[in-house]
């Protein structure tokens, strides 16, 4: 795996596991989300579709694994706006 610099400070996002109460979120189409258990893997993505307990997210290759689209369970996704985390993502 190549070691490239990520465009955002994804390493500063809090790790939130699926069994934690903060993992119970209402997510809708268009929300910016990240993968709670390991934010660096997927990066930040936009929700494209929500079907029952699954969510289709376009990560646009922003994480260290360069994943573009994936389907994940809602309990693994944390919305950026809910925790007001946008200030953590800016370059210093």
Residue spans for each PLM region:
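Intrinsically disordered, low-complexity, charged/polar segments
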Residues: 2-19, 61-92
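Basic/aromatic-rich interaction segments and small domains that mediate binding to polyanionic partners
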Residues: 2-7, 29-32, 37-72
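Short, surface-exposed secondary-structure edge patches
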Residues: 18-26, 39
């Amino acid at each position: 795996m190549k070691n490239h610099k990520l465009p955002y400070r994804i390493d500063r996002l809090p790790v939130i596991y699926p069994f934690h109460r903060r993992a119970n979120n209402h997510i809708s189409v268009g929300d910016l989300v990240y993968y709670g258990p390991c934010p660096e893997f997927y990066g930040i993505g936009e929700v494209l579709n929500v079907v029952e307990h699954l969510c289709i997210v376009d990560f646009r290759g922003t994480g260290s694994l360069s994943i573009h689209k994936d389907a994940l369970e809602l309990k693994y996704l944390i919305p950026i706006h809910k925790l007001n985390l946008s200030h953590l993502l800016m370059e210093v």
